[in-house]
């Protein structure tokens, strides 16, 4: 067909020699398809929305820049009064997070270099060490490119320049001490340039093994992170790869480039350790402290163990979660009305909610989506309403934080009758739904065969969750409430008339839903020709019951009501299945409450108050499920990693007791790490767990440095007590330097409140706090306990011989 009149002139049937045309029995016109969705933007009730998706592995910034260029070209071709307005651009979040990371890295690098200059008091030595920072990072970037790891918030957020250069610091500091001893006449050789180069070579050879071992230990400590899967794997594996690559680069540079740079520095200047009054005073007081500690060994051990025990006992008060929420700078609000809600009613509620959100000065713009797009890529009903509110910068807000803003919004929206809410963020919402199939932080899934029982139990569980502190947006995902036109065929009547079920189904489908019978062309455009009963003939149950059904052989017609029962019934709006079984879900979000504590309390309450019949069971999902999966994997991998580190230490010391002594210092990092989380108001999370893994490696490294020094001095013939005292004092400066650099390197990230800092903070806070407590106990407890463990090791060696 090329014209509407062509359709109207089609003959349907011939009666008494006269053709009955389509135009005689029907109205032929161009009409819209039934509307399945509506999009609104700020004060505009109807707009056209376009969404651009990026393919996997592409650079988001470059892709968006290309899209913006194309939009600029399209704007020039648009008709007057028509404009294109981007309402959501994810690169804004990327830019803010990159700015936060770069700022933290630059400030951290500055603090690390400052510590170098303060402690080494020689700019040439400081430069020789500091050059490792950019070069090791460049080395890491090359390997990241080979491995396919992109530079972003996660991969760069865990880079600590203090950890990266500590081996170079140990090497240069040891050389400076030897040169200073030569200047004081403690070495018989004349301290000329060739002797200094020889000393440098010997120092590098002596420390090469401990440096390799210490860095291998830190890399081994990251082994559990490499085993993470799914979400936690995608988040933390890039960080582990980046830091590992940087450490490998640091080892290579420390053992090759740094000695070369130091040799040039020695040729052009004096690298001997400068006399420092404050360091002398610090070492003097440290020597006194060690002497006192030796006389109070039992008391210090008891106090240390008591502090650790108290910290562990108080740690459950911190609460737990999978990951801290990343503030995306937007609000994603989902409202699901009863399944039978018409699109007009949903649109009416949408206008009211949009007006409420637009009334907040914190909101930049509001985009709403009712139903689904025409292409069917997001198959939601017209009872579904999704709203994205882009937020202004926080320094313009009147509310203290986002939680307070959402709480106020909730109060106003809940004043509208029958409007449930689910507040989230754009990326967070997509992540939650893809993981558990439920839009909510906490998802409770009830499995069983009977939909009625499932719905009843889901309401009971929802009521229980509403009574638990911190729960918000609690709702059972409705499966019923969908009004259906139910047509039940009377097979006996149909057999009496000789009517086939397929013929009746085809008639009902054409009359109510319409059937495409042909096509209509208007130039290059193609339109479907659809036959359907006029609305006045299908507007009520009685109208449908009067639908004419042809009898076989053209022997007349009968109404549908003669052979079927037609009625309105309430049916299931959706039936969800998982692993072959039916399920109904209950979702909840949290405000001011940790996930772990909430779920533990909720589980106990549900088990007490909700009794399931045989054949039914409950699982807890959402972000809590991710947390449990990550912790379950850590319970397996961390002991294996600890065992591998212990084997490495045993190989280094040739003594099981010395290896055990170094490992005993690791738990004391928990004191500072957990205290840091508590003071910062942060929960225990997978991010914090990764921090504890990293700081454990740093603690072991410091222990190795000190024990190696004890062993080296004892090889020179000095007694055990003297070797411990002298070695501890000698290692005070490098241990303090490495600890301060490692801590200050991540201090900006620990204190940062910029966009994207949420995921970095627990990791950084744990490392900074853990380094503080770990260093204190390494400096005090390890020298005090070493004689006990060394004697034990010596007895075992003698027994072996």
What are these regions (language model features)?
Residues 153, 201, 205-206, 213-269:
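Hydrophobic alpha-helical segments
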Residues 1-110, 117, 188-194, 201, ...:
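Extracytoplasmic/periplasmic membrane-proximal domains and adjacent transmembrane bundles
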Residues 145-150, 226-235, 305-342, 396-398, ...:
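Transmembrane helices with small-residue packing motifs
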Residues 180-202, 231-237, 256-308, 339-345, ...:
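Interfacial helix-loop-helix hairpins and adjacent transmembrane helices
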Residues 1, 9, 344-438, 463, ...:
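Solvent-exposed, membrane-proximal periplasmic/extracellular interface segments of envelope transport
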Residues 205-207, 214, 274-324, 364, ...:
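Signature of alpha-helical transmembrane segments and their immediate interfacial
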Residues 106, 110-177, 227, 245, ...:
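Hydrophobic transmembrane alpha-helices and their membrane-interface caps
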Residues 87, 94, 98, 172, ...:
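Helix-loop junctions and hydrophobic alpha-helical segments within the transmembrane domains
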